[in-house]
Amino acid sequence: MKYVCIHGHFYQPDRTNPATGRLEPELSAAPFMNWNERIFSECYGVNASTPIVDGMQNNYHHLNTDFGPTLLRWMEQERPLTYEAIVKSNKQGAGKRYGTGNVMAQGYHHAILPLANPNDIETEIIWGMRDFEYR
């Protein structure tokens, strides 16, 4: 028997203005207000609830994925139903896949770890693991 694994790497940087703590309009994301909303509409949201012949399907249940902590933090606040669908798919997968889910942790930011200094590598990994455990 042959197997295939499809991996989805999902990441959006923190786009908030540090002075205001809010997302500001991004003209290049039109017709949406910002890139988080645009990518959510085109990718993250539709994969959580995809129409199929006999109903709806959560594609995240069938993918191996990693989600950036900054994306999940935004999604937890702004799109909680999709956030919950992602968390739920990982927990459901844990009972079917040797005790582990189908989502894996990633470094906190989108750093290229082999190019980072040892202190930054350790920080990225620790922060990423702690965020993963929180979720």
Functional labels for PLM-detected ranges:
Residues M1-R135:
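Carbohydrate-active enzymes and regulators
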